[in-house]
Amino acid sequence: MNNNPVVVLGCGLVGSAIVKDFALVENRHVVAVDISRENLDALPESDRITVRLEDVSQPGKVAELVADAALVICAVPGFMGYETLRKIIEAGKDHMMAFEPSEF
């Protein structure tokens, strides 16, 4: 993996745990993205974590946020998951899913 950041889209219960884990990796920077200020404020303060208060449902926002990412983790709520994942794939980024479809 290169030195570009890991971008975590969605910092609720699952995404925040992922951010915390990646922040423990030496020489790894994490960009934590969420629409909720409360979720972002709950993350630990670290020079390895950058928080971004953003709405990934806005046109072009996902492509902008993941442009320099080494890896993108999609941890948005299930109802947003597939559409957000499609945008990550269209951006040509390595990625992983950390959401469950909300249709269940």
Q: What are the roles of these predicted feature ranges?
A:
Residues 22-23:
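Aromatic pocket-lining residues of Rossmann-like dinucleotide-binding sites
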Residues 15-16:
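N-terminal Rossmann-fold NAD(P) dinucleotide-binding loop
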Residues 6-10:
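Conserved N-terminal Rossmann-fold NAD(P)-binding element of oxidoreductases
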Residues 99-104:
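Rossmann-fold NAD(P)-binding glycine/threonine-rich loop
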Residues 54-68:
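Conserved Rossmann-fold cofactor-binding substructure of NAD(P)-dependent oxidoreductases
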Residues 66, 70-75, 95-97:
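N-terminal Rossmann-like NAD(P) cofactor-binding module of classical short-chain dehydrogenase/reductase
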Residues 27-44:
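NAD(P)-binding Rossmann-fold cofactor-contacting core
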